[in-house]
């Protein structure tokens, strides 16, 4: 549930100072679509995203929180996991007579769940940003050095990540299609479950989360806008599945969602 409005807002900063917060509520259907291996998946996730532009660039962060209830079959209720990303971009070049700009990007990722902390990482590198004249079509591409930090029994190592972020608003602002796609190199569930050790546990991980929204209240405004829609989490080597029940590495986890852009 992340980065999905960053692309549009990052382009706006080229015009004027700008800030926005949105809150999302997702009902996760992954447990139903993957009963063989995700029977313990959380049913509810909330996301808070904040973007603020200034003269030098922009700051962005999001926080995901996962929840379980009595009906989920878990003895633990309430918040059972949290994850956040915070990033800073500095604009250093703009292509004359075009809507293309370049930024220097720095980012931190970290979080935890009931089994312990996730492996933290730091990312740095360049980013390319593009938008059309009315900002209804946007695209960002990042090519980043990613350093996985040592901790919790996992070795630190150098890696990379490529990220694409897009946004398209159409049908007289009624519909928005947005999302991101990440590809990186790190420890994978499949290699760990096979009993591999050290660097042999690592492999390519792919994650994309396209979202489709119907903007039902204040659709022509960036603020006080209410949207209803869905997110599809599509991944390979990302989900830590129940190895006793499944051997596959590709997963589809859809949600039903509400979003309030403040």
Positions of PLM-derived features:
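Transmembrane beta-strands of outer-membrane beta-barrel pores
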Residues: 27-31, 65-69, 106-112, 143-149, ...
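Membrane-embedded beta-strands of outer-membrane beta-barrel proteins
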Residues: 48, 86, 124-126, 162-166, ...
């Amino acid at each position: 549930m992340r980065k999905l409005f960053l692309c549009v807002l990052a382009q706006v900063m080229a015009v004027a100072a700008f800030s926005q917060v949105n809150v999302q509520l997702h009902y996760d259907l992954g447990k139903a679509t993957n009963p063989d291996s995700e029977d313990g998946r959380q049913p509810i996730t909330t996301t808070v995203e904040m973007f603020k532009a200034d003269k030098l660039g922009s700051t962005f962060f999001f926080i995901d929180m996962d929840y379980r209830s009595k009906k989920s079959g878990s003895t633990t209720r309430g918040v059972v996991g949290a994850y956040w990303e915070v990033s800073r971009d500095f604009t250093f070049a703009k292509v004359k007579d075009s809507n293309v700009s370049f930024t220097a990007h720095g980012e931190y990722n970290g979080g935890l769940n009931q089994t312990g902390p996730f492996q933290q990482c730091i990312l740095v590198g360049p980013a390319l940003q593009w938008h059309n004249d009315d900002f209804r079509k946007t695209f960002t591409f990042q090519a980043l050095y990613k350093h996985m930090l040592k901790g919790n029994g996992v070795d630190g190592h150098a890696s990379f990540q490529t990220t694409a972020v897009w946004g398209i608003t159409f049908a007289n602002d009624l519909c928005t299609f947005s999302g991101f796609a990440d590809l990186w190199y790190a420890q994978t569930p499949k290699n760990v479950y096979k009993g591999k050790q050290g660097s042999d546990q690592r492999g390519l991980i792919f994650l994309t989360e396209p979202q489709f929204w119907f903007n039902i209240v204040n659709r022509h405004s960036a603020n006080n806008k209410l949207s209803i829609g869905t997110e599809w989490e599509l991944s390979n080597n990302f989900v830590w599945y129940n190895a006793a029940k499944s051997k596959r590495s590709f997963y589809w986890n859809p949600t039903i969602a509400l979003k309030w852009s403040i």
